[in-house]
UniProtKB/Swiss-Prot annotation:
This is Fumarate hydratase class II. GO terms for biological process: fumarate metabolic process; malate metabolic process; tricarboxylic acid cycle. PROSITE patterns: FUMARATE_LYASES (PS00163). The gene is fumC. Pfam families: FumaraseC_C, Lyase_1. The lineage of its organism: Bacteria, Pseudomonadati, Pseudomonadota, Gammaproteobacteria, Enterobacterales.
């Protein structure tokens, strides 16, 4: 039989498992929202703990919270950040849209643990109150959006941006290494004029560089914190210096550029910062999907595809076809990019659906945002390590396809005109001739003229790959 204790909130008394630190409101949420399996992300829980830690420190400094209580709350928050109470935060994403129940989950856990630190007990006789002490100068309406921004910015800074930079560096190195390899270009999935493999990969590098700039451009808005706005943005029940000082405290303990939001009404009523930041992440997903698709097409084969590059062979690809190896890293990336694009739709809908002074789609928004960051960061790390770093050119195949391409005829445009060049290409294609044989047969130029004018290495321009 499970041992219980009695906890109380404004709705009355409720039984809670005696071995748990949470209280009445957490228990009610567990009983009322048994929906699916998605729980609040750990990084969001840690961001809530950071927020409570900063608030306790500032409330103490402002003379609003007794030093011993503040110290105990800070110690309890540090325990959460160290992962000591991970099973005390069981609530579902699918709860109140303001995140109130998760805010109270944190308040209750920290209050009960702080009470124990002070020599007290858990429950109704505890020495630290979840609302009056842990939640002092706060509302769920400003705490939860603050934690969202803290979790989002730290995830972008610590996980996504480093992996994006690493993948960009790998591809830049490949671009430089393959700068002298002339290959056929393709547009509309059809043969086009030549370029170098280095130039082709340099396009991927530039895509990722642009994406990094877009993501970095979104960070200042994410760094704006709602804390201090309390219920509707007016700052009711807060000290005049509280909002600025608590943002400064969060900036100090995270070494991140957090500031108090200049307009708390916007900070509470919208998710615009995360909508816009996720738009940049969606752009990255679009670029990664294109890059991964290009890689697997260029590596297709091994004998009946394009086969211009080789990628690492990491695992067997078929349960029935012996020896088959598939571009699995590319497939994983394209799948996760699809998920990111779906997340973007959900975040856009959530961001657009707030009413009046509060957006109430916040748990869903941050769940999808953090999932996107993790998918992209992990996906880029895996793709970089197990695919991109091992890309190698198949020079023999590249040369074969280059020499067989009819689009080399484009070099003749300035010598004999477009119409005659097109006639050469069509005759060569229809009769299975080389371009040279077709041109000579039509009498438009000699062998020597063809050799002098159709030189793929001179058709790639002076564009240098990478930066």
């Amino acid at each position: 039989m499970v041992t219980v204790r009695r906890e109380k909130d404004s709705m009355g008394v409720i039984e809670v498992p005696a071995d748990k630190l949470w209280g009445a409101q957490t228990q009610r949420s567990l009983e009322h929202f048994r929906i699916s399996t998605e729980k609040m992300p750990v990084s969001l829980i840690h961001a809530l703990a950071l927020t409570k830690r900063a608030a306790a420190k500032v409330n103490q400094d402002l003379g609003l919270l007794a030093a011993e209580k503040a110290s105990a709350i800070i110690e309890a928050a540090d325990e959460v950040l160290a992962g000591k109470h991970a099973d005390e935060f069981p609530l579902a994403i699918w709860q109140t849209g303001s995140g109130t129940q998760s805010n109270m989950n944190m308040n209750e856990v920290l209050a009960n643990r702080a009470s124990e630190i002070l020599g007290g007990v858990r429950g109704m006789e505890r020495k630290v109150h979840p609302n009056d002490d842990v939640n002092k100068s706060q509302s769920s309406n400003d705490v939860f959006p603050t934690a969202m921004h803290v979790a989002a910015l730290l995830a972008l800074r610590e996980h996504l941006i480093p992996q994006l930079s690493a993948l960009t560096d790998t591809l830049r190195d490949k671009s430089h290494a393959f700068a002298d390899i002339v290959k056929i270009g393709r547009t509309h999935l059809q043969d086009a004029t030549p370029l170098t493999l280095g130039q082709e990969i340099s396009g991927w590098v530039a895509m990722l560089e642009h994406n990094l700039r877009h993501i970095e451009h979104s960070l200042p808005h994410v760094a704006e914190l709602a804390l201090g706005g309390t219920a509707v943005g007016t700052g009711l029940n807060t000290h005049p210096e509280y909002a600025r000082r608590v943002a400064e405290e969060l900036a100090t303990i995270t070494a991140a550029p957090f500031v108090t939001a200049p307009n708390k009404f916007e900070a509470l009523a919208t998710c615009d910062a995360l909508v816009q930041a996720h738009g940049a992440l969606k752009g990255l997903a679009a670029s990664l999907m294109k890059i991964a698709n290009d890689v697997r097409w260029l590596a297709s084969g091994p004998r009946c595809g394009i086969g211009e590059i080789a990628i690492p062979e990491n695992e067997p690809g078929s349960s029935i076809m012996p020896g088959k190896v598939n571009p699995t890293q590319c497939e994983a990336v394209t799948m996760l990019c699809c998920q990111v694009m779906g997340n973007d739709v959900a975040i856009n809908m959530g961001g657009a659906s707030g009413n009046f002074e509060l957006n109430v789609y916040r748990p869903m928004v941050i769940h999808n945002f953090l999932q996107t960051v993790r998918l992209l960061a992990d996906g880029m790390a895996s793709f970089n390590q197990h695919c991109a770093s091992g890309i190698e050119p198949n020079r023999e195949r590249i040369t074969q396809l280059l020499n067989e391409s009819l689009m080399l005829v484009t070099a003749l445009n300035t010598h004999i005109g477009y119409d005659k060049a097109a006639e050469i290409a069509k005759k060569a294609h229809k009769e299975g001739l080389t371009l040279k044989a077709s041109a000579v047969a039509l009498g438009y130029l000699s062998d020597a003229e063809f050799d002098a004018w159709v030189r793929p290495e001179l058709m790639v321009g002076s564009m240098t790959p990478g930066r």
